[in-house]
UniProtKB/Swiss-Prot annotation:
Catalytic activity: tRNA(His) + L-histidine + ATP = L-histidyl-tRNA(His) + AMP + diphosphate + H(+)
Gene Ontology biological-process entries: histidyl-tRNA aminoacylation
Protein keywords: Acetylation, Aminoacyl-tRNA synthetase, ATP-binding, Cytoplasm, Ligase, Nucleotide-binding, Phosphoprotein, Protein biosynthesis
Keyword Cell cycle: no
Alphabetized SUPFAM superfamilies for the sequence: Class II aaRS ABD-related (SSF52954), Class II aaRS and biotin synthetases (SSF55681), S15/NS1 RNA-binding domain (SSF47060)
Binding annotation for L-histidine: 130-132, 157, 173, 177, 326, 330-331
Keyword DNA repair: no
This enzyme's EC code(s): 6.1.1.21
Protein name: Histidine--tRNA ligase, cytoplasmic
A Pfam family annotated for this UniProt entry: HGTP_anticodon
Function: Catalyzes the ATP-dependent ligation of histidine to the 3'-end of its cognate tRNA, via the formation of an aminoacyl-adenylate intermediate (His-AMP). Plays a role in axon guidance.
Residue span, WHEP-TRS domain: 3-59
Family: Belongs to the class-II aminoacyl-tRNA synthetase family.
Amino acid sequence: MADRAALEELVRLQGAHVRGLKEQKASAEQIEEEVTKLLKLKAQLGQDEGKQKFVLKTPKGTRDYSPRQMAVREKVFDVIIRCFKRHGAEVIDTPVFELKETLTGKYGEDSKLIYDLKDQGGELLSLRYDLTVPFARYLAMNKLTNIKRYHIAKVYRRDNPAMTRGRYREFYQCDFDIAGQFDPMIPDAECLKIMCEILSSLQIGNFLVKVNDRRILDGMFAVCGVPDSKFRTICSSVDKLDKVSWEEVKNEMVGEKGLAPEVADRIGDYVQQHGGVSLVEQLLQDPKLSQNKQAVEGLGDLKLLFEYLILFGIDDKISFDLSLARGLDYYTGVIYEAVLLQMPTQAGEEPLGVGSIAAGGRYDGLVGMFDPKGRKVPCVGLSIGVERIFSIVEQRLEASEEKVRTTETQVLVASAQKKLLEERLKLVSELWDAGIKAELLYKKNPKLLNQLQYCEEAGIPLVAIIGEQELKDGVIKLRSVASREEVDVRREDLVEEIRRRTNQPLSTC
């Protein structure tokens, strides 16, 4: 017991140490190192407790989904998939884990969030961090130079999640990408159109899509005097401007990353600007940026992009924002990110902040990193942050107390008298064979009232009632659960009548 008490004291002291580091705003690396020590101590403490103290729960950053939550999820996925297919995308899938070497060096400072799998004496493996790098690997492996694809799957990040804000360690991404050599900005404009179509269809609130270009960022850093070696690390600091103030970002640049204060101030003059095509034209005349080749190329492409966005009718939802940086290393051109302008809530409630709900950009060099000959395949794409969208939809449903159906059952096969199980089984089988979504209660002689109550609770719209008289007459009594109206339908016409009432097309199964 003395050893256990000593271990508990070590856990307490280490926990206090970690909290102190966070209050002092120590570096992320230092905090992570001390958190790792704390977790090891806790694991040791857990082993001492034995199996009888095991707490049944899901791992940190993960969750189970109830039938109600899955019904919401399926509706969201359906909206997204229909949009992807409307734009001509094919679907692919890739392994949930990749060779560690495949993922290494693609994510900048976020590489520390990759989950490495324990070495089993073979290949070094990691869980996928996103769907973009595996897609680039897939293109290079299969020597593909042209494809429009979508992919919906889980990804994994060793993050400190805020699950109430839709942030997890295991979560879905819904990606759409266009690979191939095309005229400038046409595929990029379509990706932004898709993003706007999906977010509008989901009706989760007003949103704004911020756009920028990595070439403009790099040109801006160059003219401000940022050393080449610090471009990516300063970029990751700028990327935090949607979460913290400019002063905090500046302090990080100067205090942690060694940037001269006057250089940081010059960056601040640029990154606090946002607007439309007029800002693009203004920056093309900027005395410093206009002398930088990369910046001029990026601004020229953005000007063309805005022309296409006007034609697509979505320019009112787009803002050129010089603070948008997107920390991932593989972006090479246009980048974009959608954020909610407001979160609809009940009066008096705090808005639910969920951060970015969709993002993407151009990554022309990523495939070349995997190709043996370094052949590049230009790519542009987007990713929908569905977990955050689920958080918004769930909160909205809870606030409205709206009933969510968790099944698609169209009709319950019921009986009004006893000893009709065989007839119910025959009828439900006929309905299944005809493609009708049907159920029956698993009792030989269920009470009619119980069967009707089940329909009301499950949201089943129709009841097909069998009785002795109906069997003699060759009819089925079809009851509407909502109106309680009943009509006799000839058995051979029942399938068509159910389809008509539930607006179901002819089954293709």
